[in-house]
Amino acid sequence: MTNICIIATIIIYLVAMLLVGFAYSKSNNDSTDFYLGGRKMGPLVTAMSAEASDMSSWLLMGMPGLAYLTGIASPGWTAIGLALGTWLNWLIVARRLRRYSANLEAITVPQFLSLRFHDQRNLLNALGAVIIIVFFVPYTASGFAACGKLFHSLFGVDYMAAMVVSACVIVGYTITGGFRAVTTTDLIQSIVMSLALVAVLVYGIGAAGGWDAVVANAQSLPGYLTMLASHNAAEGTATSYSLLDIVSTMAWGLGYFGMPHILLRFMAIEDEKKLVLSRRIASVWVVIAMTASIIIGMVGLGMTKAGALEYLSGSSSETVIVRIANLIAQHGILAAVLAGLILAGILAATMSTADSQMLAAASSVSQNILQEFGHMKLTERQSLFAARLTIICVSVVGVVLARDPNSSVFGIVSFAWAGFGGAYGAVMLCALFWKRCNWQGALAGMLVGGLMVFVWKYLVSPLGGVFGIYELLPAFLISLLVCVVVSLVTPAPSKEIEAEFEAAK
């Protein structure tokens, strides 16, 4: 009966998401409607959609799992960097990008860069689209992996089968409803995610013997409850957390300036004046959600100490919320329904990011590669068909990449996040705030930044020491340097480009 209630709750939730997609299916009259919702998004939907699409499955799986194993330092500094990055992105990028993109009538991030620099060859369009596809596919795969882990660990359902079903639901409402469906479901999913965090915290603290017991257990573990050390569970010792480690984890915040699926939310709000309210909502929610996520990891370890939860090692630590939900479900029908909502919250975290990523990838192929770079003359209907076909292809490749049940959600997200921050972050800031920047500098910055993520991750980082820093930081800085240097040694932008820049201030 317990499993039936949980499964029924999850099915109802998934069907509701599909119905949202179908409800908006007839409102997509053109590409602007499908990709940006006609630039008619309200402040609440804009804020919560941006943050729900940002906080993927790592919020309810990766971050609690990291806190469970290593303590609060690594997830804590990461959360601080992300909170600062979120706030700065809303503060300095959102308004300028909304105004500039509307002036240029750009509906995708690569298209904005191409129009911003009057890139006649559409090289920025093509490179930007390729970068989005290269890094969004593994990012999407991490979401599918989270879905597979969820159902496999709870019901013993085949990992691959769970991924395929989850992918079909996400693809279903994304290809039918477009941006409006994605943002509306994101709002719903952010609420479900919040309820899941609260429910798990309340139950977990009680099962661990109370808050004092949770804290006492954390204090007894070397390096667990300090921001200057990391707990080594295997050896029962503390590892010093250096300044390099702090800078490396906080560097996550730089990624926000280059996240296409988040930047699209800024471009879609109905009135730039409402961005202030959106910023406040988004910033507060992010801080609360990440704090709760880290505490859940600590509470989960407290439950292990109390004998309420088995010890979770390696990537299985990412299922701590799933295990707690399973314990909640054993307390009756209503508790099982609540457990179903908690698990739906994990699905929500995954779906709210995956749908946005697939939509961004779809716009890159249909709008940026086929029409603008490839000069294909597509009708609105053909363009939307190409976009929907891209969504299906991305999901198929994502499922294939995530076929390993032992893959780390946090690890996959970390690399993809670095890719976007390194390739897009510095270039986007230069495009918005530096008038002397030109298309040559932007192109070089994107190319070098994207490549540097791979070079640093696989060639430089293994050297250890100072080179072990998170690849996003060196990629971002080198991209910025290359963008500035190349712009300065090549011809200055035309008077027309400078006039457009001034008009967007």
Stretches found by the model and what they are:
Residues M1-K505:
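Membrane-embedded helix-loop-helix hairpins and adjacent transmembrane boundary segments
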